[in-house]
Structure formats: C-alpha cells, structure tokens
C-alpha cells in the first residue's frame, strides 16, 4: 500500500467509512500479526493483539499526520501495544509444538506451514539478545527500513544498521557451525 493509498484509507476511516479500515487490514493484517508473534511468542496473544491493533487504529486514525511514514507510525503503535502487553503479562510461557499444532489442526496446510515457519524463526531468533531480535524482526517481518526502525526505537541509524549486521552475522556463524536446525 502506498502512502497515498494509506492516506485515502485514513481519510475514509476518519469519516466513519469502514472500507478504509478493511483496506489497511487487507494490506497489513498479516504483517502486523507476524510482528506481534515475534514480540509476544504466542499465537493466541498475537491474534488478540492484532485485533486490538486494528480497533485502536480505527480510534486514532485522526492522529495520523500524512507524510510521516505510515509503516513507521503503525509499527510504533504495534510495538507500544506489545510492550504494554508484556508489562501486564510478565510471565509469558512459550507454547510447545504440540499445542501450536493442535490449535492449527482445522486450518489448511499453508497455515500449518506458516506456524511451523514462525516457530522455527522464533527458535532461531531466540539465540539473539532481545534488542537485536527486535531489530531483525522489524526489518525482516515488518519490512521496515533501518531509518524507520531507528525512528521507532529512538536510536541512531548507524547503531540500528550495525546491530542488524552483527545479529545476522551471529546467526550465519551459528548456521555454519551447525548450531541452527
């Protein structure tokens, strides 16, 4: 979705037209879900947060300033929601593979593949510090640029790019040593 399309969708939302929200959801629903899944590590919580996110987006559409980067704005909202969620739920247990598989039994094979892929990705990323993992997830899952990530995290651009390269280097080294399955 381009900035112009997003701006038009926001304008429709402000006027009470749900089609604007539907367009934003269609364009970013999966991306926001993957971002939450990477941050909270539980499928049910990620789904709940995704629903809450779009309700919140509907309510705060009028606060968006055109030209400020809609992806950055949405990801800042999502990240803040995940941080608030984690504060309220300090103890966040990881789901085991059997539970995840059982939850996804009714879904199509592609959904099962997506769950397994997400579990594998989370397992791999768990080898990184929380700080590095967040940067990698924002860049790869949320498809944000380093500049957008720096803005969200309120860190220098060079630091974000360096931490990303260092994290990817660590993962490559672990893969070469056969420590990543």
Task: Please report, for each region that a protein language model flagged, where it lies by residue.
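Short helix-capping/turn signature of helix-turn-helix
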Residues: 27-30, 38-41, 137-144, 154
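Structural recognition of an alpha-helix C-terminal capping motif at a helix-to-coil junction
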Residues: 34, 48-55, 59, 68-80
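Arg/Lys-rich amphipathic alpha helix in sigma70-family domain 2
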Residues: 62-66, 76-96
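Sigma70-family region 2
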Residues: 14-15, 41, 52-69, 88-89
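DNA-recognition helix of helix-turn-helix
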Residues: 79, 83, 132, 141, ...
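Internal acidic/polar
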Residues: 2-6, 84, 91-121
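N-terminal module of bacterial RNA polymerase sigma factors
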Residues: 1-31, 38, 126, 180-181
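Residue-level preference for hydrophobic side chains embedded in well-ordered alpha helices
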Residues: 24, 28, 32, 53, ...
């Amino acid at each position: 979705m381009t900035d112009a399309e997003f701006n038009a969708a926001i304008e429709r939302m402000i006027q009470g037209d749900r089609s604007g929200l539907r367009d934003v959801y269609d364009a970013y629903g999966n991306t926001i879900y993957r971002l939450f899944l990477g941050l909270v590590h539980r499928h049910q919580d990620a789904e709940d947060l995704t629903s809450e996110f779009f309700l919140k987006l509907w309510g705060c559409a009028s606060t968006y300033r055109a030209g400020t980067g809609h992806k950055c704005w949405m990801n800042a909202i999502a990240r803040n929601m995940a941080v608030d969620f984690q504060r309220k739920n300090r103890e966040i247990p990881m789901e085991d593979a059997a539970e995840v598989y059982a939850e996804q039994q009714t879904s199509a094979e592609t959904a099962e593949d997506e769950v397994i892929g997400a579990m594998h990705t989370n397992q791999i990323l768990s080898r990184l510090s929380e700080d590095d993992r967040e940067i990698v997830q924002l860049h790869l899952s949320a498809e944000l640029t380093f500049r957008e990530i720096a803005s969200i995290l309120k860190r220098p651009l060079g630091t974000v790019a360096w931490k990303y390269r260092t994290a990817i280097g660590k993962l490559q080294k672990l893969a070469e040593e056969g420590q990543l399955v």
